Amino acid sequence: MESESESSSTHSSCDRFLDAEDEFFYDSFSNHYDCLNSSPPANLRRRRLPMDTDSSSSSSTSSLESCEKRSTVGENDELEVSLVDFETIEIDVDVTDSANSSIDSISEKGEDFEVIDSCTDTEKNMGENDSGRVDPFTVTTLNDERGEIYTGPEYTSTDWSLTSLVIRSIEFQVSLMITFIRFPPWLISKCLSFVFDPYRTMRRGRRYLVSWIVGLCDSGLKDDKPVLELVRRVTWGLFCAVYVGIMLFALLVSAFMISGFVITYLAHEPLVIKESLNFDYTKSSPEAYVPISSCAGVAFGLSGKESIETGKVKGLKDRTEITVSMTLPESEYNRNLGMFQVRVDFLSASGHVLASSRRPCMVKFSSEPIRLVQTLLKIAPLVTGYVSEIQTLNLKLKGLVEKDIIPTACLKIMIEQRAEFRPGAGIPEIYDASLFLESKLPFLKRIIWNWRKTLFVWISMSLFIMELLFALVFFRPLIIPRTGQRTQQRDGTHSINNNLYLDGQAGSR
């Protein structure tokens, strides 16, 4: 009778569970095993509760029955699996009672014991009646402290620093250098292939061009978004390149202007005067005048050009050097003349002599046999007119340093004869004469003037680099335009990283 009653009770329980929905069994089955596997293995450990010897018989029988019933899961269908799982849950209640008694005995003995259920949320969903149940295979965590959610570093506009800009510029230069190195061999190979087999090269080029155009058209016909995105990026890149080029050109022009003002202020041009001399042979000692500022009050018959305006030349503030060049014919008169003298006078605006410098000179001597040999050797150029029988005398005279009291207004060049000649005699025959005057600057000013172009370039480049660094530090948006796409990509990447991190934290819990 007892067996019949037990069989009838089991059949009634089976009928009762057969009427339930399939989702209940699947949910209970999945929740039961999800609770056991939810915690990460790195932070978990399993403890098996010790059982008292007094309750060994009941626990052993219940565990044997549960093992036997669980062994039949692989042989039965899904419905039998759910029934067996439910029966094991009932049997686990007895096991938990025995475990509770063992926990009480351990606590009475003073031993430390910690049981933390990691499936609290799942058991609450299953029912509040099972909240006090303790599974002997309960997973306990070593650390239950929840850390604050790490959202990752926040990217701002200042992350794109000068370091990244320098690195990118270096990468661009390296890639450009590699391209320049690889381009000549590639071009030579293509040219040689075109020379040796032009038709094949033309066919390959046409095939490549057609395939590229067809691929572009296919991608545009299938989906116009990549093409539009490419066009948008190219347009925006060209606009940014033009904008950055205009800003850099403006900085470069400003640097050149400032450098020009600095060089104009620092570099002083030396006074250089080159004038042809027209001597007045109506006087006993022929004279010629060269104006520095003005010779109006000095003489009435000026020699040479009178186009130097008053006030254009500020005077001889530095030491000067004067060179008088005279072209004389190798005539018998000049060879027999011998010595004569050239004098240069520095005159004020009123005609007073401020300083004077003299230099004796003569035609170069050569004996009669030497002149004959030279004439024989130069007979052809002399006959054709390429060479003339002339001599050029360059007379260098020391100048003076002008005082601030009386400025120099004019120069007077005079040819003086020797004392043995009567007035008007002893004057050489001259084809042409000229004067070259140059002021000698101080050492530092001379270096600045001689290196003015190099200094201009160096100052311009230094100012340009300083202006560029100043603009990048304080006015970066003025040089580098901001892009909304970059900010959106950073925000999207940041949000995706945060979501993935939060999902991982939720899964670990």
UniProtKB/Swiss-Prot annotation:
Region of interest called Disordered, as start-end residue ranges on this chain: 33-73
Source species, domain of life: Eukaryota
UniProt-listed InterPro entries: Seipin (IPR009617)
Cell location: Endoplasmic reticulum membrane
One GO process term, biological-process aspect: lipid droplet formation
Compositional bias ranges of the Low complexity kind: 52-63
Keyword Membrane tagged: yes
Membrane topology: Multi-pass membrane protein
Keywords: Endoplasmic reticulum, Lipid metabolism, Membrane, Transmembrane, Transmembrane helix
Keyword Lipid metabolism belongs to the record: yes
Tissue expression per record: Expressed in seeds, seedlings, leaves, stems and roots. Not detected in flowers.
Transmembrane domains' residue ranges: 238-258, 455-475
Main localisation: endoplasmic reticulum
Family: Belongs to the seipin family.
Domain notes: The N-terminal domain (1-230) determines the lipid droplet size.
Name of this chain's protein: Seipin-3
Organism: Arabidopsis thaliana (Mouse-ear cress)
